[in-house]
């Protein structure tokens, strides 16, 4: 029974991983993310289908859930507990029982969990992913190379976690097996992050311009109302101020 708390912790970490912001955010927009784009419930596909804002929200939530699951394990168990939570939360993201075992590829959750284990190695892996993705315009290539470098980074920063680092590297490579085939055939889609950021800026500019136009229209409408009221008053004022004829003037007029 002494392992029961550890087992419960692993189950909790798995269900934390089941939280799928990509699926939930896409549903908010009336879209089934598994039937749109690449069909993957992850940040990259959300970026393609829903844009930068939704992708940023997806990324942050996926990273946070990996971080929080491993942090809870670290606070209550030893290094073994943290490594088991690492594996559980990422596998929970990839194979979520609440979404019929159809999840994402686990990269963002992997980074969040890695940050809780050892943040310098996580930031080094993230930097590798960003640089490779920016140069190649292929997010999958950046993710794969970052995962492959992760055990070497852990060997330098935190040797105790080498076993989980190697295991999670194989997990991430396995989830990207389709991408690897397309990369080898030269068929992997490019993803221009710059164009997405430019599109987001354009959307923000359009929103600001629309807000200004609405404000100007409201001001013009108010001015028109004031002018109309003034015109109505000017039309009715002569009748209201017209003096009544005296009875003597009426008699004189009749005679």
Question: Where in the sequence are the language-model features?
Answer:
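Loop-to-transmembrane alpha-helix initiation sites
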Residues: 123, 139-146, 156-171
């Amino acid at each position: 029974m002494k392992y029961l708390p550890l087992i419960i912790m692993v189950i909790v970490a798995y269900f934390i991983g089941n939280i799928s912001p990509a699926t939930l955010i896409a549903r908010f927009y009336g879209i089934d993310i598994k039937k749109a784009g690449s069909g993957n419930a992850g940040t990259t596909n959300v970026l393609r289908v829903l844009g930068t804002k939704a992708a940023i929200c997806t990324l942050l939530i996926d990273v946070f859930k990996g971080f929080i699951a491993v942090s809870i394990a670290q606070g209550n168990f030893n290094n073994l507990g943290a490594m088991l939570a690492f594996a559980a939360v990422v596998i929970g993201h990839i194979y979520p029982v609440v979404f019929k075992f159809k999840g994402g590829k686990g990269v963002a959750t992997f980074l969040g969990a890695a940050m809780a284990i050892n943040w310098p190695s996580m930031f080094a892996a993230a930097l590798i992913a960003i640089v490779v993705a920016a140069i190649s315009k292929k997010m999958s290539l950046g993710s794969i190379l970052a995962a492959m470098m992760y055990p070497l980074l852990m060997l330098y920063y935190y040797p105790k976690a080498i076993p989980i680092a190697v295991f999670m590297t194989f997990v991430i490579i396995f989830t990207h097996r389709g991408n690897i085939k397309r990369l080898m055939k030269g068929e992997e889609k490019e993803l221009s992050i710059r164009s997405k950021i430019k599109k987001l800026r354009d959307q923000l500019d359009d929103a600001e311009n629309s807000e200004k136009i609405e404000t100007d229209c409201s001001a013009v409408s108010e001015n028109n109302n004031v002018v109309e009221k003034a015109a109505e008053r000017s039309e009715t004022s002569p009748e209201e101020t017209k003096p009544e004829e005296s009875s003597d003037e009426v008699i004189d007029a009749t005679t």
